[in-house]
């Protein structure tokens, strides 16, 4: 089937995602950095925050307890992490070029609702997407097949006519198991080249 739709992840694809760099900037001590990584960003509870099972305020209190940081320092760290989500210029150009080519664009991201609300006010390129699925808004999260089913049910897109782009292998595998074509994102240029395999007239 011809590809009509492209479904993008956000963190690590459209926007930079590098928590260790943010942690190191705010907390120079290596031992503290390790605790924050392990007890916050790499912990299953961060996944739950992404899923919407923890509100923003509850997450601040919770991660202050697990990391030993003050609530003010935890709040500052989460805010700094949001601020660090800068656009990846080559991917933004790719989105703009796909939109001009008539490809239907969708978003499917693991992200707290409050973080997405912060980002959508900052970046105009989100307007290129016809429908946006944010895990924290619907209590579903990749790689659960249910979040892909949610996208299909809400939009009516055909998975076999859609290519999903994500930086994490487990999410790429999940998308393929749900019938989508899929590309593991490494950088904008290789992603563009991979898309040409699905969209021969796209440059």
Predicted regions and their residues:
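Active-site neighborhood of HAD-like aspartate-dependent phosphohydrolases
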Residues: 1-42, 66, 177-178
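Short beta-strand segments
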Residues: 16, 106-110
């Amino acid at each position: 089937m011809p590809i009509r739709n492209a479904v993008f992840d956000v963190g690590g694809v459209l926007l930079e995602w590098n928590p260790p760099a943010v942690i190191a900037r705010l907390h120079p001590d290596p031992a503290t950095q390790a605790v924050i990584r392990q007890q916050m960003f790499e912990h299953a509870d961060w996944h739950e925050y992404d899923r919407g099972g923890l509100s923003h305020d509850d997450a601040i209190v919770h991660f202050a307890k697990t990391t030993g940081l003050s609530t003010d320092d935890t709040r500052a760290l989460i805010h700094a992490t949001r601020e660090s989500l800068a656009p990846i210029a080559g991917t933004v150009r790719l989105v703009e070029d796909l939109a001009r080519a008539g490809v239907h664009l969708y978003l499917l991201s693991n992200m707290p609702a409050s973080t997405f609300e912060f980002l959508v006010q900052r970046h105009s390129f989100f307007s290129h997407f016809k429908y946006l699925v944010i895990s924290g808004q619907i209590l579903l999260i990749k790689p659960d097949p249910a979040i892909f089913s949610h996208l299909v049910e809400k939009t009516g897109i055909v998975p076999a006519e859609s290519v999903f782009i994500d930086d994490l292998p487990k999410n790429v595998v999940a998308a393929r198991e749900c019938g989508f074509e899929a590309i593991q994102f490494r950088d904008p240029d290789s992603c563009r080249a991979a898309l040409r395999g699905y969209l021969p007239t796209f440059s």
